[in-house]
């Protein structure tokens, strides 16, 4: 049996969002196509994606870090003298993205091998899809280039669809059905970020 997501319920789940109508339309259109059609699955999907996107308000990753925050979050990408190096990058989001998301400096590769890829393929959408490889995979799924997909993901429908694509590729409906929030969170953000 399918669960109907009502607009007034969504408004309570994403407080402070001024675009509830557009989000409701996108969710109602896209979620069923990915089997996110039960109350439990929708609850997990909306809670995880609202955490990742600040209640559906932030569709692009904020990389405007101070030097201190930059070192705390991305210090390992700044070599032997991270403090001196990070000072050059602080408050320069494009420069930060091109450094920390460049495959040259990462153990976990993202497919970012061309100049500017870090910035072009920074986190976007409800899931904060990141890296040329992820945008290429999603783009193939929706018949777009990686570059087109990066733009699409910054729209409500594209943000929902890219999150659903990720959800589906990671088989998160199965985990939602077991109500394992910790396991799901680890798959989505690589750790336990956001868990109380």
Regions found by a protein language model. Name each.
Residues 49-53, 131, 176-195:
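Acidic helix/loop microenvironments that form the catalytic cleft of cell-wall polysaccharide enzymes
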């Amino acid at each position: 049996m399918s669960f109907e997501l009502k607009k007034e319920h969504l408004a309570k789940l994403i407080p402070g969002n001024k675009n509830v109508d557009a989000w409701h339309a996108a969710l109602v259109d896209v979620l069923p196509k990915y089997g996110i059609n039960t109350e439990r699955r929708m609850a997990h999907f909306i809670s995880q994606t609202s955490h990742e996107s600040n209640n559906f308000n932030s569709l692009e990753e904020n990389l405007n870090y101070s030097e201190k925050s930059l070192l705390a979050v991305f210090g390992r990408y700044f070599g032997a003298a991270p403090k001196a190096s990070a000072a050059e990058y602080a408050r320069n989001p494009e420069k930060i993205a091109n450094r920390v998301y460049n495959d040259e400096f990462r153990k976990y590769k993202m497919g970012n091998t061309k100049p500017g890829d870090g910035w072009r393929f920074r986190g976007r959408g409800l899931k904060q899809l990141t890296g040329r490889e992820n945008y290429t995979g999603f783009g193939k799924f929706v018949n777009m280039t990686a570059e087109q997909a990066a733009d699409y993901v910054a729209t409500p429908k594209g943000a929902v669809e890219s999150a659903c694509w990720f959800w589906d590729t990671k088989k998160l409906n199965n985990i939602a059905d077991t109500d394992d929030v910790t396991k799901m969170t680890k798959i989505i953000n690589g750790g336990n970020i956001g868990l109380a």
